[in-house]
Structure formats: C-alpha cells, structure tokens
C-alpha cells in the first residue's frame, strides 16, 4: 500500500486523520472495504475488456454458432459466460489474457494489499457447475458436479431469493475477503432439469478425462461445451409444454418472443407444467385485443406472471420487486404493463381465473 500522509484522511474510512487513527497502530483494514473494492474492479475489468478489446472479445464470442438459435434471454446468459471465459482463459490481448493485461496495466492503482490479494487470486479461478446440497442460515453448501469438491457460499436471504436445494448453479466461484462469492453473477437452473443437465455435461467431461485432461482443465478449456450442453443442446425427450408457443400463430416476432419468455419464466417449480397453456392463452388474447407495442419482451412476460398470480384462485402471491429481479426489468415497468393487461382483459378475468384454477 502507498504511504499515507499523517494529516491525510485515514484510508479505513473513519473520518479521522491517519496519524490519530490507523497510523498510530498496526491494524488490518476492514475486509468489507477490500471486498467492496474488489466488486468494483470486477465491473471495471469487464468494461475494460469490452471497450479496449471490443473487437477481439466480440469475435471470440460470436464464433460460437449455437448462439444464433437461442432466444434473447438464453443468449444474454451465454454471452456473459463466454465473455468472462474469454477474459480469463484465452489470449485475446496479444499473448496475454485480457485479465493479465489489465493487472499489468492497472495493478499498481490497487493500493490496498487485501484488495490486491483478492484480485490476484482470480488467476486461479475455475468455472464451475455446482449442485446445491444444503442451505442453512444463509450458508449454501455446494458440490462441484465435475470435480466433486465441496464449496460454501454466504448469501443474504433478505437481499435476494435463494435457489432451492437440488438446483444447479453455473458460475465463477471466487473468494472475497473472508467469504466465498461468485464473479459478478451466476445462473440458476430449475431442480426438475438437474438430473438431465448433469448427464449431458458429464458426457463431455468424461470424454475429456479419457483424453487425459483433469476435471479442472476440462472446465477451463472446454467451457463452451458446458454452455452448449446446459443452454443449447436439445433434450433427448421432447417436452410437450414447449410445443405450445410454436404452434400458436403470432402477429409478430416480439409477441412470440414474449410468449417464449413467459414460458421460460414460469417453467420453474413454482408453477405446474399444465398451467403454461392457459397462461399463453392469456397473452394471446391480450395481443389480439390490444396489439401491444413491445419494446422489451421480458417486461410483458413479468407483467403476465404478476397478472396470473393476481387473478388465480389458488396462485401464490409474488411481488413486482421479485419479478423485476427475475426478468431484469424495473418494478415500475411491470406495474405499468400489468395495469395495461388488467384493463384490457377485464371481461375475461373470471374465465381466466377459472381456467388457471382448474
């Protein structure tokens, strides 16, 4: 850490002069400050990658043909994961990775030793597919599906909806100060797909191990195959509920995209599979009566899910804030779209409520 002048404000954030605070004693700066700085550096690193090396990282991402067949939400998830993979594991900055170049150019500006220690530890980061084994008092116990290693993450249940036991989590585990975390964000897969998805990924992993790779090398070197298995590869058995969107005639692609977003968003454990056709019928009826102007399909998808919960005779309540986080839109936008749907479908509300409850 650079030398702090005695009369300068103390870097610990106390508001006191350095000579009257940490300068008068040997002290470790709060781990929380280091973790906060590390999170900011995560964002700065990604921004650096997509500005300074925009062409190389975009070319790296777009070489994966499976992206073209994905819906918008799935593609966004894939692009994020491929981007982080490219930043850390591919020499997209000459002979260096983008992360290595970033650390070389900006490392000296990271003055807090603990923060620098956290950031440098990202060099040993490995992508992971984790099975949620247990959840107690905000501590989540994971098992790495590929390496069988155990992993614990502390999550605040008051600030986010915690995934259910049995879920699969895809992400980049790291350590921030005294606790484990994920690099920026992670992806949750529904419990009902866990067994099938693990089977798909292990086919690729087993083949790599037979070729002499370690499980860790497989995740670092063939992460694109993991993404393909999880997000792009078709299930061996056709899912009947998926046919609903494709068999309906839509006025335009945005209406169809919204229907797909509704189906995707409501295919988790909260709702029975047989509910989906009735929900798609609600969206279809609204489109026929209103011909909505759709700027972001996820906004209407969230509003439809909220509407379903509002009118269903046996639906579980769900907040607009929770749906905003789920669909990546604002709560105020959901509120506006919900009012639009509610007013348009006043005459059909009782019929839809009965259909949803039967």
Curated annotation (Swiss-Prot):
Q: Which residues form a coiled coil?
A: none
* Family matches, as SUPFAM superfamilies: Cyclin-like, Sec-C motif
Keyword annotations of the record:
ATP-binding, Nucleotide-binding
Q: Which GO terms describe its molecular function?
A: ATP binding; DNA binding
Q: Which domain of life is it from?
A: Bacteria
Q: Respond yes or no to whether keyword ATP-binding is given for this record.
A: yes
Locate the residues binding ATP: 207-214
Query: Could you tell me what this protein is called?
Result: Uncharacterized protein YccF
Q: Which organism is it from?
A: Bacillus subtilis (strain 168)
